[in-house]
Amino acid sequence: MSNGAFDAIFEYAWGQIDKPISGDFIYGKDLPKLIEIIENIFQKAQKSGSYELRLPLFSEINKDLFRTFSNTKTFFKIHKEEFDDIFFNLVNHPLREILENAFIGVDSIPSDFIVSMNLNSPSKFLVENKNKNTEGAGISTPRKKLTESPIKLLSRKNIGKALEVQVEELKRELTAKQSLLQENERQVSELKIRLETYQEKYASIQQRFSDLQKARQVEDNQNSSRTSDPGSPLVTGIDQKAILEEFRRRLQRQTDTISFLKDQIRRERGLNCSNDKVSHSKRKHATTDGDGTFKNFISAVPSNIWVKATIRIIVCFALLAGVLPYIRKYVYAHDTPSQNSRLQLSWWENSGILSKIVWFFEDQTDLETEYRSNANVDDAYSRVFGI
């Protein structure tokens, strides 16, 4: 098949859509119409019965692709030089191959096909192109055929829109970051102001600490100079806990000493009382049986010392007045003890009643003296240890 047959069919269909005012291009919305014109030519040839053809030329899937392209790229300009690439990217086959495969038994479009379909007359575009070519080779230059497909152009346009969206998003993000940066700068300024304030406070506190340290050193020097004076106060730096602990330790030691002394005094009192009881028992052997009545009488007297003493004096005078005649008689009646006797008794010791009275008063005097001595000792220790 010569290229003239295919070009004649294509130019005929193109001329049905393209107008002189268009500028040698059709819009994307006209692509289905162009395909329909070409398909009508072949359907008309089949009806005439001159040729056996494989119809339809385009499947429904391909027609759907043409319609989709026309809807999405309505005002997309399709130039004649760009048509082959656009068509191939849509159906993955060139238009020339589809038209050649439509004839059964031949591999190309028959030359008489154009004559039979009255396609020999050139279209207006062929005439215009021929006129332009006759004017001169340098006047008219063919358009440079684009190698980019409409899908690439569509993807480029989509990419352009996506880039525009990204640019807008980046602008908004940049604005937000600028606002955030301004806020951070404001916070940094506030932090700098606060830092300066804290530095000033720190310098002031450090100065006060230095002044206090100097004053403390001066005070310590003054206190150390006054330590030689007995009446000078103690250094304020002494640990109060150590002082209290030392006081407690001394107080405990004094308390233990006092307890020990009191126990010793009690033991001494017990020993004296036992000695008095022993001496008193010895003296009982020199008395008569009539002393039991006197002992019972004395024990009935109240425990108060002074009352007992008064009563005892009265009783003694009464007894002396009653027994004095008997004493005289007893003294003169008995002989003087022999010199060989180991025990030399006084005249009053020979009488049981007189010896009892004398020994009673001596015992009371000894007990009172010992009691006063022990009481004085207790008072002395209490005053010494502050009890």
From Swiss-Prot:
Highest taxon listed in the record's lineage: Eukaryota
Listed GO CC annotations: cytoplasm; nuclear membrane; spindle pole body
Topology in membrane: Single-pass membrane protein
Localization, UniProt: Nucleus membrane; Cytoplasm, Cytoskeleton, Microtubule organizing center, Spindle pole body
InterPro entries: Mps2
Positions of region (Disordered): 216-235
Single Gene Ontology BP annotation: spindle pole body duplication
Residue spans crossing the bilayer: 311-327
Coiled coil: 157-269
Pfam families found in the cross-reference section: MPS2
Keywords: Coiled coil, Cytoplasm, Cytoskeleton, Membrane, Nucleus, Transmembrane, Transmembrane helix
Compositional bias of kind Polar residues: 220-230
Main function: Component of the spindle pole body (SPB) required for insertion of the nascent SPB into the nuclear envelope and for the proper execution of spindle pole body (SPB) duplication.
Family: Belongs to the MPS2 family.
Self-association and partners: Interacts with BBP1, MPS3, and SPC24.
Protein name per Swiss-Prot or TrEMBL: Monopolar spindle protein 2
Source organism of the structure: Saccharomyces cerevisiae (strain FostersB) (Baker's yeast)
Encoding gene (name): MPS2
